[in-house]
C-alpha cells in the first residue's frame, strides 16, 4: 500500500484506496510490479476485455522514480502485451495529472468528468486505437 499512499493525493484520491485493495485481492494475473534494488517502484495492470481490446488500470510509479523512464517502460510492456494477444485497442482511466503522458503514446480523450475521482481530481477516460505497434 505504500506505493499507493505515495501517489496520494496528486495522482489518486485517498477514497480510492479500498477500490485498489479490492482490485488487488481479486486480480490473480495481469497486475505487474517493477522493483529496483528490492524497492517497489512501479505497478500496472493490463487485462483483455474483448477480442480486440484491453484495459490498463492502476498504473503507479514511486515519486522518487518518476521522470526516469519507468512510465515509458510500462507503456512498452503494455504495447507488447497487446501485440502478443493481437489486441488493437486500449482503454484507460486517468486524471488531468497524467493525461499529457498518455497523449504521447497516442491516447485520445473520450470522456471527462470534473471531480470524477475526488474534488480537484478529474476523471479522464482515454483510448488508444490501433495500439499494436
Where are the language model's segments positioned?
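Conserved acetyl-CoA binding element of GNAT-fold acetyltransferases
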Residues: 52-63
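Short strand-connecting beta-turns/loops that link adjacent beta-strands
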Residues: 37-39, 49-52, 131
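Conserved catalytic-core motifs of GNAT/GCN5-like acyltransferases
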Residues: 91-93, 108-127
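A short, well-structured alpha-helix characteristic of acyl/acetyltransferase catalytic modules
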Residues: 1-7, 132-133
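Conserved GNAT acetyl-CoA-binding A-motif
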Residues: 82-95
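Active-site rim helix/loop that mediates acceptor-substrate recognition in acyltransferases
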Residues: 9-36, 40-45
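Conserved active-site tyrosine of GNAT-family acetyltransferases
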Residues: 102-103
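Conserved acetyl-CoA-binding loop-helix of GNAT-fold acetyltransferases
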Residues: 61, 67-80
